[in-house]
């Protein structure tokens, strides 16, 4: 596993000797998240405050792209470690509040221009969604809510991000079918009963 931090000015910090990592992928909210731990020397701490994004690759393939939320350094008798945690690129839309607006007719290009492009997010591909008359953006909505409502409720598709951090606004493609059978070497199994988070949402206009 190879982890790389990118600073606000474009500098890259290649993380040494990754010892532990965890990636969580999903659609919508909560967005993708990551946590990675590597060996770290105390004298290298100053540059971490300038890191804004993270990329992980395995065997030459990018497996995660996201934003840095937290850097934690620790030391014990075995030496120093660095733990970096953050979320996928959807975090940029989730963390920013949209300006209230009323569109006489809103197109996908309008939504991308006003609510996605300002955050430096690349769009990989997009379906041809119909224009929406009298589309309103409520004050207090996140940029993600604006994009999600336009695409999901008026276009019938769910926006998502790929592992390179690019926004995908198109139906799912046919993928591979993976089967865990009796001959599969399962090393661990987790059963989670999650009793928190958004279970349902009612929007009233």
Language-model segments: residues:
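Surface-exposed aromatic
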Residues: 128-137
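Acidic, small/polar-enriched beta strand-loop surface segments
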Residues: 1-4, 148, 171-205
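Juxtamembrane "anchor/assembly" segments of surface/extracellular structural proteins
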Residues: 1-47, 87-91
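Extended amphipathic alpha-helical segments with heptad-repeat/coiled-coil character used for oligomerization
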Residues: 157-178
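Envelope-exposed proteins and targeting segments
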Residues: 32, 64, 80-82, 163-165, ...
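Surface-exposed cap/loop segments at beta↔alpha junctions
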Residues: 41-123
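Amphipathic, non-transmembrane alpha-helical segments in extracytoplasmic/periplasmic proteins
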Residues: 35-36, 86, 97-123, 138-163, ...
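Structural motif
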Residues: 8-9, 58-59, 180
